[in-house]
Amino acid sequence: MSSPKKIVIASRESQLALWQANFIRGRLLELYPQTDITILGMTTKGDQILDVSLSKIGGKGLFIKELELALEDGRADIAVHSMKDVPMIVPSGFTLAAITEREDPRDAFVSNDFSSLEELPAGSVVGTSSLRRESQLRARFPHLQVRPLRGNVQTRLRKLDEGEYSAIILAAAGLKRLELGYRISMLLPPELSLPAVGQGALGIECRDNDPDMVEWMKPLHHAATACCVEAERAMSRMLGGSCQVPLGGFAEIFEDVLTLRGFVATPDGSRMIADKLCGKPESGEQVGQQLAQNLKAHGAEEILAALA
């Protein structure tokens, strides 16, 4: 198969999104050195509305709709997303051509004065952007105050440095990609803060009527990561996962066994239903669906109905 002549990559214009797009561009140039590969930077609604939490303005799909429009009208050939921002059902006309190898999937505790959540005194203000993190914090550390925190990585760090928060919780992957890993006070184990579905992985989206482009992206696909992310997304899909639902899902493969952990909680953390399930890596979707059923049977159905 011949190499592509040109590839236009649609990306959000935040520093992290552009890092991710440039990372994919670099990988593609290694594969196709003669190809003209450019980045089309775009500002999305999710980037523009910063004074309201994502759960109240329509969820993370706001970060990718404009990029999909660029694919649809031919301005771009592929779009690069954080998998945790990709809606559980990919719209008709598009396909995820590749899911890249996962960076660190954990959440990171960042503070200038404290080295762990356990050290924070009662009443300390912790900033976070997601209901998932908020519900887990409220459940495990009810003596802390949890407040919304929006904006790009640098904006969030600046708000911490200006004293608005005692600590903030961010995805470790973003900090590491931007060479800000030194800001991490503690990496939170999944037992303390279960990651978001797809956290740490990148997805490459194409038009589904462009089979050549889909084929050209295949070398970037990481099968083990994809198995894990597919299990997480299958669970979330069955639970109606969105920014309005506090849920987490994280799968890992060890010695050819996929272990998926998931939880659903009330936003205030007063109720949390958690479980895990093991299966074959190639059966990730079925493992995810079954874990979702188990969570529903144990009480998640009630929580979801109350949030609907």
Curated annotation (Swiss-Prot):
Record note on cofactor: Binds 1 dipyrromethane group covalently.
GO biological process: protoporphyrinogen IX biosynthetic process
A GO MF label: hydroxymethylbilane synthase activity
UniProt cross-references to InterPro entries, sorted A to Z: HemC (IPR000860), Porphobilin_deaminase_cofac_BS (IPR022419), Porphobilin_deaminase_N (IPR022417), Porphobilinogen_deaminase_C (IPR022418), Porphobilinogen_deaminase_C_sf (IPR036803)
Names of the cofactor(s): dipyrromethane
Disulfide bonding pattern of the chain: none
Residues where S-(dipyrrolylmethanemethyl)cysteine is found: 243
Enzyme class: transferase
Substrates-to-products reaction catalysed: 4 porphobilinogen + H2O = hydroxymethylbilane + 4 NH4(+)
Domain of life: Bacteria
Metabolic or biological pathway: Porphyrin-containing compound metabolism; protoporphyrin-IX biosynthesis; coproporphyrinogen-III from 5-aminolevulinate: step 2/4
Keywords in alphabetical order: Porphyrin biosynthesis, Transferase
Record-listed E.C. numbers: 2.5.1.61
Annotated GO CC locations: cytoplasm
CDD domains referenced in this protein's UniProt entry, alphabetically: PBP2_EcHMBS_like
Matching Pfam families: Porphobil_deam, Porphobil_deamC
Cited function: Tetrapolymerization of the monopyrrole PBG into the hydroxymethylbilane pre-uroporphyrinogen in several discrete steps.
Assembly information from the UniProt record: Monomer.
Stated family: Belongs to the HMBS family.
Further comment: The porphobilinogen subunits are added to the dipyrromethane group.
Protein's name according to its UniProt entry: Porphobilinogen deaminase
